[in-house]
């Protein structure tokens, strides 16, 4: 029997994950790779259309994998030899760890004066990389097998040559998954350009409270611009999400904001407090909510969310999340790890294992939350060293490799905490001190478990759900 890997699939590998099949062309480009064990992958390499494979000689796992890939259309079987693989389908190992997506600041400039900006864009602390630097980043992304970028800034649409970047990304088989924007420059012409080059991203718009948005964004008319952009995206069939930073001036607008966004076509709303980084440092003392005040806002809103018919996907920090139209909610802060778990095998941050952030200076960071921090200033730049190399051997790589056992060895309070198996260490970035020490406990999640807890959230949510269900 002969087997052949169908197009657009190719044999691929990454440093640390060397055995994979992934799509390298067309619409399937969006799909994540399929990873395999060594023995199964070695058998799959014979699926080149020209060498016979005896299914009976395969181990049980490999036979099952062959059948599954045949049913999915990844493989074709034939009793006669077939056309050999195309050159791009042959096995290639990328010189990088596997990066599912890269969050990229294509500029540090912004046309707003946001009071909470992570990268202090209104004050010009960050530059705009040159066009050649951006094109080099795109070439590096392709060389490392990255197929998705999420574009941010500053405000990304202030770049005058976005069209060149959109085209270059498409030419290098990289699609834009999401664009983070303040929406002030989002026009039909921008959407036309994206579609021209084969991109159909979702958009995350900042929307900081109905009737309150302009204050945080620092410019009059910002809310009207966001409203126009939401309706444009809805009209053109582009997905929109919203992010709201909760503070003292907009805390009473949460319910109205969620209902408005749902009506305007946004499918999700993520609510957080502004991080005490960048510009917000000068406003936090007067306008930041205490943790207790934030919990009270969330506690009061959860019943209203259910009363309103769950109008939008929502996440209230780590306290509560729920899908539109569903009562199947979660408490994201809470994990349920087994008592015998080996912490030396658990990453401190699971979420950043296969993602990265590239700053306007080209610095490689685990996520944008590290911007303007000591970690940022100590991190390497892809303008100076190759991305593939930095993904494996750099300060970034050390952060990615940090395990929960490293935290527990340094932080006795965390190691002895009765909530450890529920919190699993919290967030590395949230825990980071002003001098850049990230091997300390996350005070935000500590406060949640010691002062609120899962039971309190569930009591509020369950009572609200019971109130909207028909009485039997």
Predicted regions and their residues:
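Short Fe-S-cluster ligation motifs
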Residues: 137-154, 440-472
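Local cysteine-cluster metal-coordination motifs and their immediate loop/turn environment
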Residues: 109-119, 366-369, 412-430
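Radical SAM/AdoMet-radical enzyme domain recognition
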Residues: 119, 131-152, 159-289
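Short, small/polar residue-rich loop motifs at catalytic or cofactor-binding pockets
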Residues: 348-353
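N-terminal pre-triad scaffold of radical SAM enzymes
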Residues: 90-116, 146-151, 157, 355-358, ...
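Short cysteine/histidine-rich zinc-coordinating motifs and their immediately flanking basic loops
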Residues: 122, 126-130, 426-432, 437-439, ...
């Amino acid at each position: 029997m002969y087997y052949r890997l169908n197009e657009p699939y190719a044999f691929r590998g990454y440093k640390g994950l060397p055995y994979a099949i992934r799509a390298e062309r067309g619409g399937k480009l969006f799909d994540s790779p399929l990873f395999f064990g060594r023995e199964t992958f070695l058998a799959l390499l014979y699926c080149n259309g020209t060498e016979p494979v005896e299914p009976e000689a395969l181990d049980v796992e490999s036979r099952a994998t062959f059948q599954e890939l045949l049913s999915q259309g990844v493989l074709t079987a034939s009793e006669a030899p077939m056309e050999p693989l195309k050159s791009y389908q042959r096995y290639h190992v990328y010189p990088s760890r596997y990066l599912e997506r890269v969050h990229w600041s294509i500029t540090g400039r912004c046309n707003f004066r946001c009071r909470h900006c992570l990268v202090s864009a209104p004050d010009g602390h960050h530059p705009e990389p040159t066009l050649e630097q951006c094109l080099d980043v795109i070439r590096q992304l392709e060389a490392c097998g990255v197929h998705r970028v999420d574009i941010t800034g500053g405000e990304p649409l202030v770049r005058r040559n976005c069209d060149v970047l959109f085209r270059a990304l498409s030419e290098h088989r990289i699609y834009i998954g999401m664009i983070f924007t303040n929406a002030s420059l989002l026009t039909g012409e921008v959407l036309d350009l994206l579609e021209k080059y084969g991109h159909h991203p979702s958009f995350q718009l900042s929307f900081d409270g109905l009737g309150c948005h302009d204050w945080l964004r620092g410019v009059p008319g910002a809310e009207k611009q966001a409203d126009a952009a939401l309706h444009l995206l809805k009209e053109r069939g582009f997905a929109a999400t919203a992010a709201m930073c909760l503070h003292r001036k907009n805390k009473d607008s949460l319910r109205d904001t969620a209902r408005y966004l749902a009506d305007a076509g946004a499918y999700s709303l993520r609510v957080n407090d502004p991080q005490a980084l960048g510009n917000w440092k000068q406003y936090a003392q007067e306008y930041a909510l205490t943790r207790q005040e934030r919990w009270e806002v969330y506690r009061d809103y959860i019943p209203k969310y259910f009363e309103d018919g769950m109008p939008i996907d929502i996440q209230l920090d780590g306290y509560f999340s729920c899908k539109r139209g569903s009562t199947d909610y979660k408490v994201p802060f809470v994990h349920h790890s087994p008592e015998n778990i080996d912490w030396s095998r658990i990453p401190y941050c699971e979420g950043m294992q296969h993602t990265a952030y590239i700053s306007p200076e080209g610095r490689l960071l685990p996520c944008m939350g590290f911007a303007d921090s000591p970690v940022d200033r100590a991190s390497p730049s892809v303008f100076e060293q190759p991305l593939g190399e930095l993904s494996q051997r750099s300060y970034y790589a050390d952060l990615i490799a940090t395990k929960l056992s490293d935290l527990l060895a340094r932080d006795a309070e965390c190691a002895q905490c009765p909530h450890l198996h529920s919190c699993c260490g919290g967030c590395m970035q949230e825990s980071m001190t002003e001098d850049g020490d990230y091997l300390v406990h996350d005070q935000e999640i500590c406060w949640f478990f010691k002062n609120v807890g899962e039971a309190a959230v569930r009591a509020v949510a369950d009572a609200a759900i019971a109130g909207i269900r028909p009485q039997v």
